[in-house]
């Protein structure tokens, strides 16, 4: 028996021992994560303690990172000192308690009822009942037509049939042929219909104005009913008598209190609370990566004595010295526990009470602003007396039959009013959609249709979808006309009038009396609201006070913790310098803590993903319709591409995670250097790009259509499956484990001592080795320099200078508009203007675009030659300035030397002779252009237009915060715009289009999406350029032409153009002015005098046009200028002018003797 018991005991001990190290239910990878987290926490504690000893710790940043709040907002919060605010609030609350102590729920209810009745009084005061009594629908309806026709019924029928056919309604083949053939013949009827629109719109306005007055009659009727139902004629005087004493007690609080700004102070405090609570910090941990959870810091003390740490790190050696060194950190951890608790209380209570708290500042502001100079008692007595006098003529009786008759007739007239408004809205929408030029294009295309496959031909017409929208809109007209005619017949026999009801009630005399005796219901309203606010403050104060107390407690614990850490830096530093603290022995402890902590966070994401592997695999089994929806309609290109065949990538992800789990089992049993291989294996897992959050958003918009698939995408949308983005963190973590092992081995005396033996070496060998080392070092230095950013750029520039193509230069010249400007001025033009050879030489050597033009179309070489700056001329020629470039006078730079300078410029004779010799000297020589500097990403100023996806925009601005702005600025380099799937910018907004003519680089919104996936693509803006713009239904492909022209500052497109506006209203005046002036034109502030311009002159780049541009809206008579015999005027509508700009067609005046535009223009 004893033998059996011994055998059984031995078996139990063995079983328990063999399973002691395994945590049931946890994966091997999870257990490695838990164990390495011990090392991560200890390392982070050492790093923070070392920073405290060396006085480099940024304790506020450490705490805010632990709390996961924004450091700036939190610091602003702690700087808040609301002591004065609390004092005012306590004082006000005390007075409010005294004032409302005798009040009850009935008083609060009566206050609400008084406010409602006071609103009716205000309506009676302001209403003109004499006028309302004269309104009669039969009189108005005599002026309204029985029918409302604008288009021929045959045209509406054609459009209805086209709409049905295009939407897929089946027709016989012969009928369908007739339907589409009829499109070719409807042009005349369509334009006839459209021509009637101005008169039709005017008629609608004439109908709608008097008819809408009937709606006001209903409001008047509702007021009369309310006056009767509330019985205010008797109730108001009685209530004023009954509650005068408690009212005056409450109102007295305002009289005995100085006017303050309590509401504004509280609003500022709550705004800071809200910013701090609701704005999260960056998810990337830098100082506390070892403590991802709130309780992790307190675990460090136990980590040092844990079995795993003793076995894998200290390997049985005493940890007492390290425990002693980290005692101050443990005190910090204890103090932080109180901070966490205070923060959680503050955050949770504020989130619960935020809606209520948001209403209190306004309530307090109204109390602060209350008028204390009114004699309340006298006012209430006068109010009651005036009310009784005026309402003695009022009869509180409403005839039931009259009311029923009114409501019946109102329903009939109301249908007519709504019918007219519906037609008016339809006409307004059609007018907005209609574009004459685009319609001409559609009808031209329709006339080309042939009988065979006519529907397919129609569908291929460019932008036919826009035409179809107009057709669909017209199909609504028939039903709108029918509704109108039906409503007219019903209402035409219905007399709508309030004359008898108003007369019977005596409202005319009552309202006149109220107006004459100045009842002043608005002042009573302010008093009633003040009383309401005081009573409400008594209810809300406890919530407000609790939140303020939470804040004070949080601030107290924060300051105590910061003071504790500052104490460590003063006392501990002296002790550490004498004893040699072990926490100071490791180099870059903070870096290792950062790398190891963030590497483990990446492992944690893999663990979470591994738990969801079944759900991940289900995503490969979506039905065909859902897959097609993603491939064809997801707004993000890379997701469409990925979902063409997502299965292999997703299955490989799951397979890689399972392999990592399998290898973790063997790693756990080995030493630290073997365990770290989990990071190396993890870094090889690529994963998949972020797709599920975007797909989930796509499915969410479809309602229940993809409910089964959405359960999967919802579950996966929170997972980070793009493990390739964590490769750097995992690799860094692996290297940090190596360094940490060396540190701990040295700390615990585990490093083996190496014996050193001396050997004699030949001096010749030593010399040869030294020479070889020097040569190797020189070669390595040259090669190594090439791996630095400066070296790489310099080597690339050398290559481009000797072997580069024009296209290579063009890629960099795209940024010349921004690279070559200082304080908004081009550095070349400015250097010549200032005669600054030093700055000019610096600019050309760093590759500034050398043929840039000033606003007069002259290059720097033209200006330098014209002014006789021979040293500047030589610098420009020797650095590749184009000597054949023609300015707007069709002169080369050399031709800018005055012909008779010996007579006209005697003081510059030597200068011009020197310049002539320079041109002769280098006439047959060509010079290379210097390589333009690469425009750094850090100098990007990116502005994102409002129509882009809000989620993508917010993520992008967060990720690239330093180079993005939510404000448009003169320094903006890139403008991200919403484009179609074809990459076309569609907009009629000149405030957005102005960026094209400003010279900013216009990029598609898909750039943001791809940059979020791979931030290196921020440098590849050239792959996302917008090349086409659709304005007023027409597509133009000159966007990049404008960018390049502005980058190189070519001859201004509108040089010699003088613009005058002939419009009653120009909503885009500021944008048009900026475009015109930016392109070298002149915006005139008054109508031009033709005599000030030379006959026969033209803008330099538009010899086919007159120099005076008149922009008009088509309303004025401009035939005199249109038929000008001298062809000095060119007339444009705003759209035609933009068409000129977008086409960017140039007709250069090649005449060697250009006629100046202005009579007094200088050469």
Curated annotation (Swiss-Prot):
ANK repeats lie at residues 856-885. This is Ankyrin repeat-containing protein F37A4.4. Disulfide bonds: none annotated. Residues 929-1025 form the BRCT domain. Keywords: ANK repeat, Repeat. It comes from the Eukaryota.
